[in-house]
Amino acid sequence: RLRVPLHVNLVEGYPVAPADELDMLVDERGAFKLDFLGLLIKGAGPQRAKLADQIERECAAQIARFVAEFPESRSGLIVDSHQHAHAIPVVFDALSTAARAQNCRISHMRIPEEKLSAYRACGRAADIGLANRAKCLILNRLSRRMRENLPRGCKAGPFCGVALSGSMDRM
């Protein structure tokens, strides 16, 4: 039986929740305005609580829409996000809270922790660009917090893909 994961999006396109309730997340056209780094910085700033509330509202709207289409997922929601935004503490916390509020049990969450030693072992470390190394370091740091705060019974499998992103065609 195929299970469909929810791919939460907070960084591209338009929200599911009313845009007029998400002024920290959307621009004047109602489109998402923050990327991963923007969410990370604002999530550590003085307006963290307001941002968390808006992220929670949008996550709840996305979960509700998803569960309406896939009601069986309520008892075992599989979650990840666009640009791995769910690794950001304010997003992770808001997403977890939104799932609980929607009476959804998160059974699996992608943790974007990538072991760069695997690339060294197979002779591919030189293929990892500086920007991708930085992304991996940031995501690995955030992933440790995620792992410590996963909902009870939630699983996270192995992950790879950030280190060589943008260069997969050279494989």
Pin down the residues of each PLM region.
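Active-site gating loops and adjacent loop-to-helix segments of metal-dependent hydrolytic enzymes
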Residues: P15-A49
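Short, flexible active-site-adjacent loop segments at beta-strand->alpha-helix junctions, enriched
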Residues: V8-L10, G38, A85, K115
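Cap/lid and interdomain-hinge subdomains that line or gate substrate/regulatory clefts
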Residues: L40-E69
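Active-site beta->alpha N-cap acidic-glycine motif
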Residues: R1-G13
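Generic secondary-structure boundary/loop-capping signal
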Residues: H7, L22-D23, R29, A156-F159
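Catalytic domains of cell-wall/extracellular-matrix polysaccharide-remodeling enzymes
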Residues: Q62-I63, V67-C154, F159, L164-D169
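Surface-exposed loop/turn and secondary-structure junction residues enriched for glycine/proline
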Residues: V11-G13, L25-E28, I88-V90, S167
